[in-house]
Amino acid sequence: MKRQSDPKKGALTGPSQRQLRAGELIRHALVEILREEELQDEALQNISVTVSEVRMSPDLKHAICFVEPLGAGLTGQDTTDIIKGLNRVSKFLRGRLGRSIDMKFTPDLKFIHDESFGTAAYMDKLFLDPRVQQDTRRLSDVVDDEDEA
């Protein structure tokens, strides 16, 4: 997560508690809206989408929504089309969101593909590699020897 600088300390700080709480509120509301609404965009017909995270701007007027389309056989182009479709209907979703949450301002929505699922799958694949498993076995043997001593 991108960190913001704290002008008082000169150090990096994370999002505020308010931003985190608003992001979770919007994420839950978006999940319900996407589950219940029949979106008219062609790229979004019969598609399930997971909203994994919503990051809010400090003024809570902009939200970046990280999404992962679900479904077997989706290609990179399909995913790109789905993200573009979500961005096309973002004004509609914002209107529905405004009716379902209690915030002073309903944030503008921007949808981005969440790469963390692909990264996790790649890491799992790496850990299953025989060379890596050999190294982890050696490491566990060293740790066991230290525990016995």
From Swiss-Prot:
Gene name linked to the record: rbfA
Self-association state and partner proteins as the record states: Monomer. Binds 30S ribosomal subunits, but not 50S ribosomal subunits or 70S ribosomes.
NCBIfam families: PRK00521.2-5, rbfA
Domain of life: Bacteria
Pfam families, per the entry: RBFA
Gene Ontology CC, one term: cytosol
Stretches of the chain forming a coiled coil according to its record: none
GO BP annotations, alphabetical order: maturation of SSU-rRNA
Species of origin: Caulobacter vibrioides (strain NA1000 / CB15N) (Caulobacter crescentus)
Keyword Cytoplasm: yes
Protein name (Swiss-Prot/TrEMBL): Ribosome-binding factor A
Keyword list, A-Z: Cytoplasm, Ribosome biogenesis
Similarity comment: family membership: Belongs to the RbfA family.
GO molecular function: ribosomal small subunit binding
Subcellular location: Cytoplasm
Function: One of several proteins that assist in the late maturation steps of the functional core of the 30S ribosomal subunit. Associates with free 30S ribosomal subunits (but not with 30S subunits that are part of 70S ribosomes or polysomes). Required for efficient processing of 16S rRNA. May interact with the 5'-terminal helix region of 16S rRNA.
Main subcellular location: cytoplasm
